[in-house]
Curated annotation (Swiss-Prot):
Annotated GO MF terms: 4 iron, 4 sulfur cluster binding; carbon-carbon lyase activity; zinc ion binding
Function as written in the Swiss-Prot or TrEMBL entry: Catalyzes the synthesis of the hydroxymethylpyrimidine phosphate (HMP-P) moiety of thiamine from aminoimidazole ribotide (AIR) in a radical S-adenosyl-L-methionine (SAM)-dependent reaction.
Protein name as it appears in the record: Phosphomethylpyrimidine synthase
Cellular-component GO terms for this entry: cytosol
Catalytic activity reported: 5-amino-1-(5-phospho-beta-D-ribosyl)imidazole + S-adenosyl-L-methionine = 4-amino-2-methyl-5-(phosphooxymethyl)pyrimidine + CO + 5'-deoxyadenosine + formate + L-methionine + 3 H(+)
Statement: the UniProt record of this protein carries the keyword ATP-binding: no
Native source species: Prochlorococcus marinus (strain MIT 9515)
Amino acid sequence: MRNSWIKPRLGQKNITQMNFAKNGIITEEMNYVAQKENLPSSLIMEEVARGRLIIPANINHVNLEPMAIGIASKCKVNANIGASPNASDINEEVEKLRLAVKYGADTVMDLSTGGVNLDEVRQAIIKESSVPIGTVPVYQALESVHGSIDRLTEDDFLHIIEKHCQQGVDYQTIHAGLLIEHLPKVKGRITGIVSRGGGILAQWMLHHFKQNPLYTRFDDICEIFKKYDCTFSLGDSLRPGCLHDASDDAQLAELKTLGELTRRAWAHNVQVMVEGPGHVPMDQIEFNVRKQMEECSEAPFYVLGPLVTDISPGYDHISSAIGAAMAGWYGTAMLCYVTPKEHLGLPNAEDVREGLIAYKIAAHAADIARHRAGARDRDDELSHARYTFDWNKQFELSLDPERAKQYHDETLPEEIFKKAEFCSMCGPKHCPMNSKISDETLDQLNNKLAKCDIKV
């Protein structure tokens, strides 16, 4: 779809959506996004230029269907997939991608760390995907030196970052905000550093006693991203891994650096979103969202959860969806899903489904709470179908039609029950929706009540 859009841009020094927007140019991607979001193209351009909205769209991801992440657009959901040294293969990861897109993932991150050829699995995912693909390049940087931190050089990081751009990765998590002077601040934590990328860079800095190379070479990374229109997802290496550690000095010190890096990327006209926690008590979620907006000049916020309890292994998709809905309501632009396997193991296809549906509910609830235009239309349509016992319409409008039909059919599987004015909960005699009272009857009652001087 995008070949004809991209061809005229080839050879230009800076082909980012932000660069075009700052120069008053509405790109085809901006027009496409405007139609999807039901917003004016001019507003999309203005928000991209301001940095409050991003369109992750690498020029080498030609089968991408552009989408927007930002405060002006609907709340989005990301799904993580990826092979590990102990589980999965390329075909399984591609199948997870298909399932993620089927159940509504707006973007997908390939977090593969081993067990397969990382280049091959990434290429297969990008080729198959119509949604933006994100990666964490430090994983492959470490894998490229067989896990030897002492052999990992600054140039190794940049080489892998450019390779991901060349392959068509739309956004990359760059853990540039973790500085060597931040490391002592984790001393009082229960769970220390829980970011894999942050852990790798912490080890690198301690071994070499040098500053984070992703920070010192940040402008070089910006130059790479300009050539491909790759977007920064600035990683939060010091995100809290438990409620005890939430909103501590370590997290907030890194957040301040992420704000600095956001503005440095914008000076290069490179798009940015900023990653956030993590594990956060409900009463601290609003503070975390507001603080990110303040420190990072309203760049789109992208949070993992946050989980609002630490005692829900096996059900962390529920614990985190509660926090995600609140974060979305307060203005978070994208929610990174959590599956039932969080903290326990590598998610399988069914875990991907469970996590995604939980997060589509959270994002949708946030859009309703923020009074997005048309956000509640589908809810109202389903409610009308429910009241008229249009079972097939109810299934169709559900976030997971297959699951809704499956649960209905467990007790009433015959086709005749798709027209029945009851389900197995109340049966044919006790469903309150069968006791329909006409508007005419209610008007007559209202008149009688008025004559009796009964206030209603």
